[in-house]
Amino acid sequence: MVNFSLEGKVALVTGASYGIGFALAMAYAQAGATVVFNDIKQELVDKGLAAYEAEGVKAHGYVCDVTNEDQVNNMVAQIEKEVGVIDILVNNAGIIKRIPMHEMTAAEFRQVIDIDLNGPFIVAKAVIPSMIKKGHGKIINICSM
């Protein structure tokens, strides 16, 4: 059987300080990829870094709001400078409002749409040019509403 290897690949998993994103990033690390993740707050990035370290993974964490195009562009440029060009993007960052829809305000729904739909577009837009230059890349989008 051929072993699955991501040696030499850089994987950015958004919102991967914990939960599904953390589990996905751990799988990429176990396959040999260099793991990069972001979260919206420094405290979440710090907790994520500690969790990866506890699992024996050297991850790279960045504070970035995926709905802010300037922050995303700056993060991607910083990752490319410090870690390398992103080969794999997993758009995992998301938000869920745990309230009945009929109780949700339009502003709350717009926040969900902004993070869960616009965020993946903004991050993908930032990484695609380098993927095109390299001649390859993978983008995986995860979304729930």
Model-derived features with residue positions:
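Flexible N-terminal pre-Rossmann segment of NAD(P)-dependent oxidoreductases
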Residues: M1-V10
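Conserved glycine-rich cofactor-binding loop
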Residues: V10, S17-G19
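Conserved glycine-rich Rossmann-like NAD(P)H-binding loop of the short-chain dehydrogenase/reductase
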Residues: A33-G48
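The beta1-alpha1 cofactor-binding region of Rossmann-like NAD(H)/NADP(H)-dependent oxidoreductases
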Residues: Q42-E43, Y62-M75, A106
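Substrate-binding pocket helix/loop in short-chain dehydrogenase/reductase
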Residues: P100-M101, E108-I113
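A short, exposed helix-loop element centered on a Lys and neighboring polar residues
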Residues: A124-K125
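Residue(s) in the substrate-gating loop at a strand-loop-helix junction
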Residues: S144
